[in-house]
């Protein structure tokens, strides 16, 4: 049981590291896009979701679509399971179309000086051993120790 818990904890940490990498890449996309543009007018309406974050959501949807499509063809699955996944696949493809359209519209608005976005730093805490209570040791006086 203890080995299983340790393995589970290692998996969680690996997932956290990959999520941090995804967040870092989304920020880099936004930074590179902003660097490719002339300065954006601060008086323009601000779009709260950045292109990088939309692209990140599209990548997650792509994975869901891939794996859901596999489930529609899995011969060892029940007919009901395959049907449920066909229905899910329709929804996921619809969501991908909506999101891709929103990204295209946002980018067109940015390029036409109708909207702007800012680089938002995610500042995730879960991988920082000085900020995540699971990763730091709490002393008897409850002060976190890095």
Where are each of the predicted segments found?
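Anionic, Ser/Thr-rich low-complexity intrinsically disordered regions
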Residues: 1-146
